[in-house]
Structure formats: structure tokens, C-alpha cells
Amino acid sequence: MTVAETIYLGITSTGILGLFLIYLGYPLMVLLLPKRNRPSTGQPTPTAATLIIPAWREGKGLDQKLENTLALNTSEIEVQVIVITDQSKPSELPAHIQWITETERLGKAASLNRAMQQVNTPIVIFSDANTHLNPAAILQILRSFTDPSIGAVAGEKGLMTDRDSGVRSERIYWNYESALKKLDARFNSVVGGAGELLAIRSDYFVPLPPDSLLDDLVISWEIVKQGHRIAYAPDARALETPSRNLREEATRKIRIAAGGYQFLDRHPLYAIFAISPSYAFQFLFRKWARWRLAPVLMILALIGNTGLLYVAPTSHVTEFITSAQVAFYALAALGFILEAGRVKLGWLAAPFYFVFMHVCQLRGWLRYRFGNQSVLWERTTRS
């Protein structure tokens, strides 16, 4: 093997093995490592909570959210609801629902800061207006707070299964994420809850920088920063419909990626490690490596493979790696065609969504670097 062949093989192997470590190696590690999480039940279940629903240009979607909220099983607890929105207050509204109308659009983070000023319960629950909670969601969330070490609880995010439209491959990603959250919580702590359903102890809330793009990740980090863990409540479910089409899903992915790069710039990995080494280990694989390394590793694997084709085109190693990469990207391309044609993908959803996700991450990085991602995100239309 020549020096050039060795170099290009090393580049290719770094890319492929790095991706394997990020997406499959980490779950295996946290599965095999001893649990740091030692749950206790030293406190009674909270009996009062506030549900905050931020909404902008939701229209009928907000009406449906209110119907869903009123149908929740809250007979055992006192639940206050704060709706902060641009829409006018309905003429008839239950007494436990507080309506805050915003005339100026300042972004979600600013809206949450304003709503938090009205909270007087020990627990606050954030839930996006485009999601529906299962009837027992709030009860399941509150039960996790019997452990005094828990500062926040992340619910389960899922997609409604009774719809035939939307980006079908989105579901396979959230199934993977749900499995990882279970492992994260078992090992130590969930690494960032989703804004669809996230609860915290009200006293631990730290006002958000108004220009925050990923408010849920910032809220989660502030909880960990104060020495608390984030639990996972898989039976508290927030369901939303899939994105209407690939363009809408790409818009959502790109803005999330832009927010991720903003968070990484403001919270360097070494600073996270100094506060919580165990959380930093999780954050390294769950967020940092995905955003900073994964797209680059995919490019490295392609560059190295191209070099191998140039210096050693007849090598069995080159033939094997090239065949594997060509097959993978061909399946991803086929998945794209089928997804665009709204044809059921089956297992083809995995290679397609993997490539699609990392392309969106690169676009999100470009948008953030060039300052083109506004805090005033446009609402994406769900199916």
C-alpha cells in the first residue's frame, strides 16, 4: 500500500468510523456504562402547575390547542394556562386561562420571558401551539418531580400516525431520538428537552437572551448549570403532524441547525465540561459532534474515497468502500424521489433522512454564519 493510498484510506476511515461512533457508538456506550442516575422519591408529587402556550399566527391551530388543553386529565391538580399570542382574546374563556396579546413581534424567547413573569406555581410546562398532548401528559410530567435532583422533565415528542400526508421519513428520526432519550435519562440526564413538551421547576428559570434561536436547549442547559438533571417522561406525549412537504421540513431543520450553532458558540464544550463532566460527555456526542463534526465527516469520507479511486482504483479495499458509498447515496437519492412523490419509503427512509438532515445542518451553519437566521422564525405549515 502506497503512502498516498494509506492517507486517503485514513481520511475515508475517519469519516465513516466517526459517523458510526456518533450515531451508533454513543448509544452502545451509555447502554454499557454504569448508571449515574439514582432516582429517589423524596418529595410529594406537585399538585399545581402552569402551562405556557406561545403562539404566533396559528389561527385555527390555536383553537385546536385550547380544545386539547381543556380535555387534559387535570382533576387531581390545579393547572393554570397562559396563552401568549398575537391573536385577540376570545369572548368566552375559562377562568384558569390567562390570555396575553402581543402587539409587537419580538420572538419566542421574549414571549416566554414575559409569560414567566405571570407564573406563581412550582412547576411550569412549555408546550408549542401546534402540538396535542395526550390526556395524562401533565400528570405523567409532574410525577417525575418527586425526585429532588430533577430540575426539568422532557416529554415524548411524536408524530400523528393517522395522517397519510407529510414527510414520512421524519418519523424514523423521532423514533431514534426517543430511544436515545431513554438511554440518556437512564445513564444520567436528558440532553435538552424539546419545546413541544418541556417542564421545569419555576424557581430554576433563568430569563432567556431575547435573540435565542433554540429556547428549549437554552432552558435545559440553565437547569443543568444549576446542578440538576433532566428526566424523561415517555408517557407524556406531545404529538404533531409531519411537515407538509420536504421544503417545509428543510426550513424547520435549517433553523434548528442555525440555533444549534448559536448555542455552541455561546456555550463552548470546555465550559460545559467545567460545570458537569458527565453532562459534557453526553453533550459531546448528542449535540456538539452532530453539529460540528458529522457533516464534515460525511464530506471527508467522500473526499478520501475519491482519492482512493485516483491512486488505487483496482484495490479491493477501494472497490468495497466505493461500492458501499455509491449504494448508500443511491438509496438516499431513491428515497428522495419516493418522498417527493409521497410514496411510502419503508427502510429507505433511513439513508434518505440521514443525508437530508446533514445537508440541512450545513445550510443552517451557513445561515447562522452569515447572520441570515432571524429570531422571528416563520411558522412552518404542518400537514
For the regions a language model picked out, list residue spans one by one.
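Membrane-embedded multi-pass helical conduit in multi-pass membrane proteins
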Residues: 4-5, 21, 43-44, 240, ...
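Cell-envelope/extracellular polymer assembly enzymes that use nucleotide-activated donors
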Residues: 47-50, 80, 218
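Short, acidic, metal-binding catalytic loop of nucleotide-sugar glycosyltransferases
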Residues: 67-78
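Conserved donor nucleotide-binding strand/loop of the catalytic core
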Residues: 80, 93-118, 164-169, 174, ...
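Acidic donor-binding/catalytic loop of UDP-sugar-dependent glycosyltransferases
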Residues: 129-144
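Catalytic donor/gating beta->alpha subdomain of glycosyltransferases that bind UDP-sugars
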Residues: 145-176, 211-212, 220-285, 353-367
